[in-house]
Design a protein with these regions (language model features):
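OB-fold/S1-family single-stranded nucleic acid-binding modules
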Residues: 61, 120-152
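Structural detector for short beta-strands of small beta-barrel domains
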Residues: 25-69, 112-118
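Sec-dependent N-terminal signal peptides
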Residues: 4-16
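Short, intrinsically disordered, charge-biased short linear motifs at domain edges
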Residues: 46-48, 70-72, 131-138
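OB-fold (S1/OB) nucleic-acid-binding surfaces
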Residues: 51-95, 143
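Short nucleic-acid-contacting surface segments enriched for D/E, G, S/T with interspersed K/R
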Residues: 88-115
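Cleaved targeting-peptide boundary
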Residues: 18-25
């Protein structure tokens, strides 16, 4: 009996982690999930004109390895956990991101711990990204301008 209780307490955190988001339904190119999570990682905004023309203006987040476990992924989907915020203006204000960037720089990046609500997993095999709602952020580092990567 003691072994059973010990095993139950040891697996409880894993079960709780796996249930951060609960699948709701498919809509268009997205699988919709309900729930919330607190994640640590890197926020970013790319202002490179070519990128903006192709993908549009977005503020995105890449969770660190530990936090990535909270992001819903169907079996076999090995994409890096990465998403953008559906409430762009709130994210821009929260992270204090400017609308312009100096020459030879393409993006802003910083670190933060964020809380997100609901998750829309992009499932189409084309350009696009997952979307979620930014609820709050703390431990925010100031955004730093990142130089453009030169491609040869």
């Amino acid at each position: 009996m003691k072994k059973f209780i010990l095993v139950a307490f040891m697996t409880l955190p894993m079960l709780a982690q796996a249930q951060t988001f609960k699948y709701q339904k498919d809509i268009s190119n997205f699988k919709q999930y309900k729930g919330d999570a607190t994640l640590t990682g890197t926020y970013s905004r790319t202002l490179d004109p070519e990128y903006l023309e192709y993908m549009g203006d977005a503020i995105c987040f890449e969770p660190d390895q530990k936090s990535s476990a909270h992001i819903p992924r169907p079996k076999g989907d090995e994409r890096t956990a990465w998403f953008c915020f559906s409430n762009f203006e709130q994210a821009k204000k929260t992270f204090k991101l400017p609308d312009t960037i100096k020459k030879d720089y393409c993006s802003y990046e910083g670190k933060a711990t964020i809380t997100i609500k609901d998750y829309n997993l992009f499932v189409e095999e084309t350009e696009g990204f997952d979307l979620t709602h930014l609820v709050s952020a703390k431990n925010i580092t100031s955004a730093k301008a990142v130089k453009c990567e030169t491609q040869y």
